[in-house]
UniProtKB/Swiss-Prot annotation:
A ubiquinone binds at residue 201. This is Cytochrome b. Heme 1 (or BL or b562) is low-potential and absorbs at about 562 nm, and heme 2 (or BH or b566) is high-potential and absorbs at about 566 nm. Binds 2 heme b groups non-covalently. The chain crosses the membrane at residues 33-53, 77-98, 113-133, 178-198, 226-246, 288-308, 320-340, 347-367. Its main location: mitochondrion. The lineage of its organism: Eukaryota, Metazoa, Chordata, Craniata, Vertebrata. Heme b b566 binds at residues 97, 196. It is found in: Mitochondrion inner membrane. GO terms for biological process: mitochondrial electron transport, ubiquinol to cytochrome c. Belongs to the cytochrome b family. Pfam families: Cytochrom_B_C (PF00032), Cytochrome_B (PF00033). Component of the ubiquinol-cytochrome c reductase complex (complex III or cytochrome b-c1 complex) that is part of the mitochondrial respiratory chain. The b-c1 complex mediates electron transfer from ubiquinol to cytochrome c. Contributes to the generation of a proton gradient across the mitochondrial membrane that is then used for ATP synthesis. One of its GO terms (molecular function) is metal ion binding.
Length: 381
């Protein structure tokens, strides 16, 4: 008798995606992060759903409703901190996932890569509107500063900002619509994830060697389900250590003060996962130029398939580009650090150098390194 999972219309889809899926036999633990992102998304949707049951999206009661969740709701503190720190874990996994894609040349699966960029942008939008909801000082001023950047768009900028605010400042209408966006966006992300997987399963996964692995495939289950399970256990362990021992280490103390439009915090800054882009934004003195650099800092990922001219796939056997890659990662960490520092010397200068380096490495140095490596290959082969 034929196994039900292979014949049932619904189970058949799950079977082809997670059980009998042919996967390369040599993919390393760097390929675990896709499944970890799926787990993070499920944690965020579930904890978010329970938080939404008790949260009120009104400027008068938003802050106190979050306090009520932490103090009066059974395990409300746990749900709230799981949600807040779950977002940080989500971004850590996402940055590693993108970094692995760049290192091993996964961007050559262009449809999957481009949907991934859309997913990254959508997740960043979701996290931004979510950060506004507790209605603390940093929530309010973060929302004011970031949405106000749209006023840099010529001609329609000011009208666009007022349209998003629902008035002449960040107020009740803004909070209500941000809550609506924050609720719906994770489901849009889930839909994009399915499209991401659809495109991935059309071509099959990349692998560390960068060679075609069609001649050497193994079933996803049990091999990679067990391997992924180890990653999931490790992820949950780190998340629970964060939640139970250091719940506020990644947050901002200013957000424990209710929003006050009459009092500006000393240093307005977003959550840590946006600091690299924020540093790039601040390093350009012109407002419109800063906004363009901010957007390009993410959209530049789309240029990777276009700028690749190397004969080899991935950076495994390309020492020059490999060195540039790690310089790029170090540069990202410097930008993240600078984004959290006040706007004064020497931080502004370091930020400007790091911002120029960020774009130079991708657009100029990596393509040059590709050409050099190709010429070295020609000499020996």
């Amino acid at each position: 008798m034929t196994i039900m999972r292979k014949t049932h219309p619904l189970l058949k889809i799950i079977n082809h995606s997670f059980i009998d899926l042919p996967a390369p036999s040599n993919i390393s633990s760097w390929w675990n992060f896709g499944s970890l992102l799926g787990i993070c998304l499920m944690i965020q949707i579930l904890t978010g759903l329970f938080l939404a049951m008790h949260y009120t999206s009104d400027t008068a009661t938003a802050f106190s409703s979050v306090t009520h969740i932490c103090r009066d709701v059974n395990y409300g503190w746990l749900i709230r901190y799981l949600h807040a720190n779950g977002a940080s874990m989500f971004f850590i996994c996402m940055f590693i996932h993108v970094g692995r894609g760049i290192y091993y040349g996964s961007y050559m699966l262009s449809e999957t890569w481009n949907i991934g960029i859309i997913l990254l942008l959508t997740t960043m939008a979701t996290a931004f509107v979510g950060y506004v909801l507790p209605w603390g000082q940093m929530s309010f001023w973060g929302a004011t500063v970031i949405t106000n950047l749209l006023s840099a768009i010529p001609y329609i900028g000011t009208s666009l900002v007022e349209w998003i605010w629902g008035g002449f400042s960040v107020d009740k209408a803004t909070l209500t619509r941000f809550f609506a966006f924050h609720f719906i966006l994770p489901f849009i992300i889930t839909a994009f994830v399915l499209v991401h997987l659809l495109f991935l399963h059309e071509t099959g996964s990349n692998n560390p060697s960068g060679l075609n692995s069609n001649s050497d495939k193994i079933p996803f289950h049990p091999y990679y389900t067990i391997k992924d399970l180890l990653g999931v256990i490790f992820l949950l362990m780190v998340l629970m250590i964060l939640v139970l021992f250091f719940p506020d280490v990644l947050g901002d103390p200013d957000n424990y003060t209710p929003a006050n439009p009459l009092n500006t915090p000393a240093h307005i800054k977003p959550e840590w996962y946006f600091l690299f882009a924020y540093a790039i934004l601040r390093s350009i003195p012109n407002k419109l130029g800063g906004v363009l650099a901010l957007v390009l800092s993410i959209l530049i990922l789309a240029t990777f398939p276009l700028l690749k001219s190397s004969k080899q796939h991935g950076l495994m056997y390309r020492p020059i580009t490999q060195t540039l890659y790690w310089v790029f990662i170090s540069n990202l960490l410097i930008l993240t650090w600078i984004g959290g520092q006040p706007v004064e010397y020497p931080f502004t200068t370091i930020g400007q150098i790091a911002s120029i380096s960020y774009f130079t490495i991708i657009v100029i140095l990596m393509p040059i390194a590709n050409m050099i490596e190709n010429n070295i290959l020609k000499l020996y082969y």
